[in-house]
Swiss-Prot record:
InterPro entries: KH_dom-like_a/b (IPR015946), RbfA (IPR000238), RbfA_dom_sf (IPR023799), Ribosome-bd_factorA_CS (IPR020053). Belongs to the RbfA family. One of several proteins that assist in the late maturation steps of the functional core of the 30S ribosomal subunit. Associates with free 30S ribosomal subunits (but not with 30S subunits that are part of 70S ribosomes or polysomes). Required for efficient processing of 16S rRNA. May interact with the 5'-terminal helix region of 16S rRNA. It comes from Citrobacter koseri (strain ATCC BAA-895 / CDC 4225-83 / SGSC4696). It comes from the Bacteria. This is Ribosome-binding factor A. The lineage of its organism: Bacteria, Pseudomonadati, Pseudomonadota, Gammaproteobacteria, Enterobacterales. Keywords: Cytoplasm, Ribosome biogenesis. It is found in: Cytoplasm. Its main location: cytoplasm. GO terms for cellular component: cytosol. The keyword Cytoplasm applies. GO terms for biological process: maturation of SSU-rRNA. GO terms for molecular function: ribosomal small subunit binding. Monomer. Binds 30S ribosomal subunits, but not 50S ribosomal subunits or 70S ribosomes.
Length: 133
């Protein structure tokens, strides 16, 4: 029977949990004043590199997002050290942080659909108003 998840996926899943804990408890950078969430981790096949996707609670300010990503990238060595101790990996992957805007885009798309449905309902209730457009 084939494995459902390979080693890179299992390590990435565990790494996502551990990085979230490290960011919550260990990192005290003021540039990360906003709540940081690890939304995903992608591992290379040889487990040497990891792309860490993060979102921020207050992500309306683009400069704050850039500063947050820069702070995470600067702290990646410290995070790798803690990660190596927590996960007992022989080789801790090189971490690269990316801002994940999929959550924001999903909410934007949901709002657009909601507005279209609401507008459609209003047109059904008042069909005379649509002829004036």
């Amino acid at each position: 029977m084939a494995k459902e998840f390979g080693r890179p996926q299992r390590v990435a899943q565990e790494m996502q949990k551990e990085i979230a804990i490290i960011l919550q408890r260990e990192i005290k950078d003021p540039r990360l004043g906003m709540m940081t969430t690890v939304s995903g981790v992608e591992m290379s096949r040889d487990l040497a590199y990891a792309k860490v996707y993060v979102t921020f609670l207050n992500d309306k300010d683009e400069d704050a997002v850039k500063a947050g990503i820069k702070a995470l990238q600067e702290a990646s060595g410290f995070i790798r050290t803690l990660l190596g101790k927590a996960m007992r990996l022989r080789i801790v992957p090189e971490l690269t942080f990316f801002y994940d805007n999929s959550l924001v885009e999903g909410m934007r798309m949901s709002n657009l659909v909601t507005n279209v449905v609401k507008h459609d309902e209003e047109r059904r209730v008042n069909p005379d108003d649509s002829k004036e457009d």
